[in-house]
Amino acid sequence: MLSKLDKWLDDNFKEIIKIRRWLHQHPEVGFNEHETSLYCQSLMKKMGYEVTQNETMKTGFYCDYGNNEGPTLIVRCDLDALPIQEVNSCDYKSVNEGVSHACGHDSHMTNILGLASYMADTKQKINGRVRFLFQPAEELAPGGAVVMIKAGALEG
């Protein structure tokens, strides 16, 4: 199993880095993660996932892998960034004035997108379901967890 994962990581490393850098460069604050959400949804759709999203979720969404014949495991990431000016000088520095992923949410999203891609690419067989949940506004109170719960993202 590990060698299969190692090979997949070697084959996809550059794409994963590209995704993380795009996310880092385009941060958006809570409930305004429109571009971020659409980017992540687009990637999930390209992998073959069906996106579940509704008005109550605002910019949040989720995608399921597997079947309903067993437990559901939810893996969650945060879509939002912080209203903090980035002072780094890297080529993927935030292009949005006064907003940055100083919180690491760009890495969280990349981890979830990478896992979703690995599972789809290698057609992992599971009894149950993995729900990839992309939560908006984690940094706000009350934040996006409340809207995702109200929208039924924890049901099923």
PLM ranges: what are they?
Residues 107-156:
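Acidic/histidine-rich catalytic neighborhood of metal-dependent amide-processing enzymes
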Residues 103-105:
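Membrane-interface loop-to-helix entry segments
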Residues 2-101, 114-127:
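Acidic/His- and Gly-rich active-site-bordering loop/insert found
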